[in-house]
Amino acid sequence: MKKKTKKVEPIQMNTSVKRRKFLNLRMPKSSDHFLHAAMIILMLFGIIMVGSASMGVAGGNNRFLVITIVKQVVYAVAGYTAMTFLANRFQLKKLKSSTTFLVILATIASLLLCLLFAETNGARAWIRIPLGVTEVTLQPSEFAKIIAILVVALYLGDNVHSYSKRFDLIKRPLFIDGVILFIVWILQSDFGSMAVIFVIICVCFLVPNHLQLRGYQRILTILFYGVVLLGFYILSPSGEHLIMKMTFLKTYQIKRFISAINPFMDQYGTGYQLISGLISFATGGWFGKGLGNSVRKYTNFPAASTDYILAIVVEELGFVGFIGLLAVYGFIIFVLLRYAMKMRSEKGRIILVGTAMYFLVHMFFNIGGVTGLIPLTGVPLLMVSAGGSSTMSIMACVGISQAVIASYRRGEIR
């Protein structure tokens, strides 16, 4: 007698295959593995430096130090999971307005939710979640940076030729990104995040090659150079008087401008952390004092693991460590821009350029603030500063970029 064999139902097979694909945490074969390796290096380096920089804040409290490191590891794992998930699941052709609009609404709702929580450093930009012995904070404005990039890609990429009027072309992205900027700057009072989002949007807006956009792009370019020149003038001794006339800035923001010009005017107040950071830079030398051997982190340096972590990096690893960190950032930006220059898909190019600018603008604002070249904005050093929102957000953004790169290398987009 022939043995009866059970037939596997096609539906069950399809379901199991889909489940394996959904839970797949490996990067696509067609993704850029060098970019992936650079992200892992930054992720591990960030965990190590957060642990080192937090020793001073812990003040011998080993429990606090362990909790801080564990939180950073959890954030890194969550970010890595988001990166691999999006690298496998994100598709440009499925970037449709209906789905994206729901994400936009959720982002705006979370931004408004921050207003219910207490103010920190002059801004209401965080959602605080008590979790046993610690507290988890989320900053929705970090995730809004991804949304801002996708909004420009959705409405200005590839399909813009169907519009007959110039304003019809930009009204939707202008409105959505305008609402995000309004909430972050006016309602949350988070000038640093607003500035980062604004610069990213402006650069992404310059990417599409469309006749009806060129007039707006020229105006935007002129305004950009004008703002840069005005900034240089304000931060010069002759332009210092203009700072006091900026009524749209809060008192603490005006003090940051003044501290950037001369931190010794308030060396025990707003200028204290900047002076401490500059001392760390000066004492680091070429090769630093060694990992974990920073002296300044044991002084009153509360932002040592966040805004000023670069000062601890330079003090412990020296100028060589600083150049090495810049090299990793530079490599990531180079890879993203190289693929953006190669491909014709404007949606893909906008996403890649936006992700590159995400890295570049954060680098500029953080390094500039720590060294006193520009006022401190509270913008973290991506993947290195303590905090989960910026780490998870940038890794998710790189995951989307890797999906675009993989599609390009497979020939699915040009």
Predicted regions and their residues:
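Membrane-helix boundary/helix-loop-helix interface segments in multi-pass membrane proteins
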Residues: 2-7, 19-29, 33, 49, ...
